[in-house]
């Protein structure tokens, strides 16, 4: 026995489903702008030396990933700038400019150095982020639960779901006989909240991190900080990666490879087309021009035009 589908009112779509979507997008945009303002006004000083080191590491990794897209001369210039010139005492390269530092004998001191336990601004920023994600979600959930409680908002047009999804898709509706594919208003809000990350990234122009993952990370108690790798060891490993590269340009024979890809995707035989074009050109060159006949003989056969005098007036 098949169950007859429930016909939902159009007003539910206009006054429940669409308003939740619009308000959720507006709240996401406001949350993003407020978080940017809070980051600008935080005034946390940045270490210039560490910033330069991170930019150097990013530059080296980009070169390792995309070295075959630049000319060979440009690659060797960058390699000499980063790794230095072999046999030269003056040009040792940026990656060899930092000398190894004396490491602390106690590893716990190294682990807790430059961590959030010694830097109070890190704890402040973490609290600000948690507040910025927690307050809008609690407010939105209370708003939906107060104004739209008890509504069957929509039906999922998917394959039949199991009974395990009932507690997630029908929050606020206590009906055991209702099909699992029907979604309540509160569950519709949660579905939109979990699935709005990609839409916000496209419309707002920002790669936003999902709020649920940030709330999950903030709820977990932080453990001891991990030991940071010294910068000279990172430089040494990146230098080895550059020196292991054997340059092979991606632009070599790119025309032939492009034509091969087209041949694989299409059924055209370009060699046969070229032969046909050459044969057509040869045929047109072998055709002799026909002599043009003059039309002077036709002029002799033209009719004579006679002129008659008008009759005299009486």
From Swiss-Prot:
Low complexity compositional bias, start-end: 272-293
Positions of region (Disordered): 272-314
Side of membrane Cytoplasmic, spans: 39-130, 205-314
Subcellular location: Endoplasmic reticulum membrane
Biased composition (Polar residues): 294-314
Function: Part of the endoplasmic reticulum membrane protein complex (EMC) that enables the energy-independent insertion into endoplasmic reticulum membranes of newly synthesized membrane proteins. Preferentially accommodates proteins with transmembrane domains that are weakly hydrophobic or contain destabilizing features such as charged and aromatic residues. Involved in the cotranslational insertion of multi-pass membrane proteins in which stop-transfer membrane-anchor sequences become ER membrane spanning helices.
Protein name as annotated: ER membrane protein complex subunit 3
Record organism: Dictyostelium discoideum (Social amoeba)
